[in-house]
Amino acid sequence: MFKKFTREDVHSRSKVKSSIQRTLKAKLVKQYPKIEDVIDELIPKKSQIELIKCEDKIQLYSVDGEVLFFQKFDELIPSLKLVHKFPEAYPTVQVDRGAIKFVLSGANIMCPGLTSAGADLPPAPGYEKGTIVVINAENKENALAIGELMMGTEEIKSVNKGHSIELIHHLGDPLWNFSVE
């Protein structure tokens, strides 16, 4: 999603009203229930959320100059900077060491990268197709990427072929390096 994202893709910037800010907080908590305990730390009551409208109907939301989440259609997706602050709040999968270089170059994740030794998928029933997941790597402390499941985790285990996660955002991509100022 952010492979060719540049400053020229930004169309407008505006401050978000406090009523919309409350709605965004509620939506984040609904999508990621584990974030409820830290939502006020994440978006302090006195802080101002800035909405940055971009090309392809992408909306970035920044707090204090840092993009914390973004939206393509309806679902709010955390940025990796937010994930690194609160890693336990999101659905997570783990790829094996062999997949790291491909993930960091922006490639979609294949099923074998999630089912081999060193990889980790959640126990049954797992996650459904379309779930936004944080992608960790074997023996690495911080998340590598964020993606959307192209099939459920149980199907990934049984099929073990083809693309399983469409990458949305990864370390080193233009969103990771994007500066609001």
Swiss-Prot record:
Modification sites for N-acetylmethionine: 1
InterPro entries (alphabetical): MCT-1/Tma20, Pre-PUA, PUA, PUA-like_sf, Uncharacterised_CHP00451
Subcellular location: Cytoplasm
Domain of life where this protein originates: Eukaryota
GO MF: RNA binding
Principal localisation: cytoplasm
Family: Belongs to the TMA20 family.
Purpose: Involved in translation.
Protein's name in the database: Translation machinery-associated protein 20
Organism for this UniProt entry: Saccharomyces cerevisiae (strain ATCC 204508 / S288c) (Baker's yeast)
Organism phylogeny: Eukaryota, Fungi, Dikarya, Ascomycota, Saccharomycotina
